[in-house]
């Protein structure tokens, strides 16, 4: 009989082992056996908690996305300035948070994006994440710009954030968070300046 309260601990242990496995060998070679070994559990535990490897991958991405949302939320709560610019800055910073630009997270994101084109559950998660970023950006730009320009600015900034993240992840060097944030801020400021015209 399982110990009461072990499920959240065990699930987190398996998610962290999945991140470690993907970092070490990639998504394709991150077998259930390897993940279980890294977590120090039997293979059957993964099936018990997640059904299969796809369920574990979806849970791992859910965890990474929740870390992204938490990074933005924590920054938003610390704001003393309620301007659209301040809110846009925390969205940008949250997307380049250490939880999103470390090796295991970046490799898992990259593998997730590739897999999401073929697996409906992962595709659904990707659409949710994409819509959340766009919606949050559009909401803040809308406070300063007409709807058409707000939508256009939100699409552009979302694409820039993803592009900067992707280039940083694929560079092979340490992710230059400061540079990525500076470039995104410059784009944001160019868009917000349109309200003054």
Swiss-Prot record:
Q: Which residues bind DNA?
A: 31-50
Repressor is among the record's keywords: yes
Q: Which Gene3D superfamilies match?
A: Tetracycline Repressor, domain 2 (1.10.357.10)
Keywords assigned by UniProt, alphabetized? DNA-binding, Repressor, Transcription, Transcription regulation
Pfam family membership, one: TetR_C_6
The answer to whether keyword Transcription regulation applies is yes
Pathway, per UniProt?
Answer: Amine and polyamine biosynthesis; betaine biosynthesis via choline pathway [regulation]
> Where does the source fall among the domains of life?
Bacteria
Q: Which residues form the HTH tetR-type domain?
A: 8-68
Sample GO molecular function, one term: transcription cis-regulatory region binding
| Gene Ontology biological-process annotations | glycine betaine biosynthetic process from choline; negative regulation of DNA-templated transcription
| UniProt function note | Repressor involved in the biosynthesis of the osmoprotectant glycine betaine. It represses transcription of the choline transporter BetT and the genes of BetAB involved in the synthesis of glycine betaine.
Q: Which NCBIfam families does the entry mention?
A: betaine_BetI, PRK00767.1
Task: State the HAMAP family in the record.
Answer: HTH_type_BetI (MF_00768)
Write down what this protein is called.
HTH-type transcriptional regulator BetI
Q: Which species expresses this protein natively?
A: Pseudomonas fluorescens (strain ATCC BAA-477 / NRRL B-23932 / Pf-5)
The gene name on file is betI
């Amino acid at each position: 009989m399982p110990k009461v309260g072990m499920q959240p601990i065990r699930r987190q242990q398996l998610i962290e082992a999945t991140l470690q496995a993907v970092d070490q060998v990639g998504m394709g070679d991150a077998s259930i056996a390897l993940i279980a070994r890294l977590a120090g559990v039997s293979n059957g535990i993964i099936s018990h908690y997640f059904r299969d490897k796809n369920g574990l991958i979806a849970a791992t991405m859910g965890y990474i996305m929740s870390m992204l949302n938490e990074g933005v939320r924590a920054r938003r709560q610390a704001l003393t300035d309620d301007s659209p610019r301040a809110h846009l800055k925390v969205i940008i910073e949250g997307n380049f948070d250490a939880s999103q630009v470390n090796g295991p997270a970046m490799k898992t994101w990259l593998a997730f994006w590739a897999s999401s084109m073929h697996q409906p559950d992962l595709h659904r998660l990707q659409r949710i994440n994409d819509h959340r970023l766009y919606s949050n950006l559009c909401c803040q730009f809308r406070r300063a710009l007409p709807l058409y320009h707000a939508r256009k600015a939100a699409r552009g900034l979302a694409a820039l954030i993803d592009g900067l993240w992707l280039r940083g992840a694929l560079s092979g060097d340490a992710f230059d968070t400061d540079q990525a944030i500076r470039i995104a801020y410059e784009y944001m400021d160019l868009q917000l300046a349109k309200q003054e015209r």
